[in-house]
Amino acid sequence: MSRGLGDVYKRQLFEETPEIEARMMLKGVLNKGQEDVALNDIVVGRAGALRIIHFNIYVNGELLNSYQADGVIISTPTGSTGYNLSAGGPIVEPTASMIVVTPICSHALNTRSIVLSAEDEIVVEIGKGRDNRTEIAAVSFDGEQTIEIYTGDQIVIRRAEDTTKLFKLSKISFLETLRKKMKGS
């Protein structure tokens, strides 16, 4: 009788001591009082009409930049290999303590991702649209819960107090996995 991969993982999980990795999460609090957490990312993106949105990003109370873009991805290291990577953001080792800010299709030539300390507080504030129109945007937590926000609304994003604990059943390192993905296998 052959043993499947599931049997190997069951044995590692229940008979051996599996390695446990703690992964940081983000907490987002809207000025409307709504809040949620995300393991991968919090995305502020356009909603409604298919036009760029205007928004400001503050880090620890200081203006980082004003953007005209399709949105912005605020990512954890775990989420850096998902939407963040697709938008041109950096790959971050998943157990690192940092936050990545990546604009989505910015209407500027010099816009790049920024890597911040996990202790920084980020505020995304929705600005006024063209001709002083009210902007409509959407906030998404790990692509799940989506909340509409409007001109003047803010979301405060910081490291969550809780972490996600993952059982590491494979002995394959992050770098080996990354190397295989970069080769297309």
State the predicted function of each range.
Residues 1-9:
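Single conserved hydrophobic/aromatic residue that forms the stacking wall/gate
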Residues 10-13, 40:
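Charged, amphipathic alpha-helical segments
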Residues 12-16, 45:
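Mid-sequence acidic-hydrophobic segments that form the walls
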Residues 22-110, 118-120, 179-184:
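ATP/pyrophosphate-binding catalytic subdomain of soluble kinases
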Residues 44, 49, 60-63, 112-185:
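ATP/nucleoside-binding phosphotransfer catalytic cores, i.e., glycine-rich phosphate-binding loops
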